[in-house]
């Protein structure tokens, strides 16, 4: 993005404040363009009226991310990679979380392919209010046989809606896979210095994204990318090679940094998403599969943090996948807006009029920790999430985001009446918000009980203190 102020975007807008975009003013809409919560297509006059055509084209150019965004696959599960504007998250945010593709090989028997594909497709890990998923399937042409590869590709796409990567350096094999995967927008892996012409022709013929590959040769990689761009191929992914150990790993790390820095600083010839291959850990001579999985996870972690936009992985063991998906979720959390849940009254279990009423803040990690501690111990209760702008209990109580007035307002907005909806007219407050006890009692005219400092101690606290003494 070449502009960073709403004022700069505003001058390319109709400036009529028509409200058709859903914003009250064109300046407000300009703000959504800068923070990337809105798109130029959200402004009907800008799109429909010919007099704005030049302004629209220039605005689109100025708003385009420094790193090109590439889409793999189709439909709801299509994977967007790239699209970043900064080297460091705190300067804006990172967009398009690192996509994780897990491999299958065409020399596996059909039942094994189907089983692995279903395992990849069905993977789900609940974390802070959302399900973490895997992103796609990389189909390796281990046989180097076009017919066998086509059969494997057909079997994969019949059993998943996830996007796929077709992996071979043999153009004939890739063509066989493309014929089967027509309309699925697969990613081609890969074009190198030996096959670039044939693979480039395939990318143009089938209109699919393609990886250009030059191991530890950034000049060669840039030349390939430039050649493909000049040929009219826009959706390019860079593979500088991923060496799993020693000096090769150090060089790989440095190459990722150089590529991304050059792209962000304006070198459009190499401003494309980067592919990492942590599965090379399995080629590092590590005999023990657990140790190989561990090292693969280490590599995945390194390149999630340092600009890997898409990864090819092998191990599906929980001890490998859980750190990988958790880290990606954490790194790609938007620092401009803390992860928060809706501020409202939630039911935990099957509460009744005799069940306890508690509150916490709407910071997602806090809320789901408390909710989990209550639910896992079979405590049926009412749990209110107070709007603290996504800040945890202790910080919100200290900073003024959690006050007696805020708690009262949250109860009123939730429609929950402590006098009629429960029989005990009591509220349990977090131990870290104990300073608010008196104020809450005055504001709500209820009995306030100070709970433990840690929600993990709630079961023991409930045994001793609930129901409240009359």
UniProtKB/Swiss-Prot annotation:
Query: What does the entry comment about cofactor binding?
Result: Binds 1 [4Fe-4S] cluster.
GO MF, one term, reads: methyltransferase activity
Specify whether Membrane is a keyword of the entry: no
The coenzyme or cofactor needed here is:
corrinoid; [4Fe-4S] cluster
- Judging by the UniProt lineage, the source's domain of life is Archaea
Q: Name one Pfam family in it.
A: FeS
> Which reaction(s) does the protein catalyse, per the Swiss-Prot or TrEMBL entry?
5,6,7,8-tetrahydrosarcinapterin + methyl-Co(III)-[corrinoid Fe-S protein] = 5-methyltetrahydrosarcinapterin + Co(I)-[corrinoid Fe-S protein] + H(+)
Where does the chain bind [4Fe-4S] cluster? Answer: 18, 21, 26, 43
Keywords, alphabetical: 4Fe-4S, Cobalt, Iron, Iron-sulfur, Metal-binding, Methanogenesis, Methyltransferase, Transferase
EC annotation?
A: 2.1.1.245
Pathway(s) per entry: One-carbon metabolism; methanogenesis from acetate
Its biological purpose: Part of a complex that catalyzes the reversible cleavage of acetyl-CoA, allowing growth on acetate as sole source of carbon and energy.
The UniProt subunit note reads as follows: Heterodimer of delta and gamma chains. The ACDS complex is made up of alpha, epsilon, beta, gamma and delta chains with a probable stoichiometry of (alpha(2)epsilon(2))(4)-beta(8)-(gamma(1)delta(1))(8).
What is the protein named?
Answer: Acetyl-CoA decarbonylase/synthase complex subunit gamma 1
Species for this entry? Methanosarcina mazei (strain ATCC BAA-159 / DSM 3647 / Goe1 / Go1 / JCM 11833 / OCM 88) (Methanosarcina frisia)
Taxonomy-wise, where does this protein's organism fall, top ranks first? Archaea, Methanobacteriati, Methanobacteriota, Stenosarchaea group, Methanomicrobia
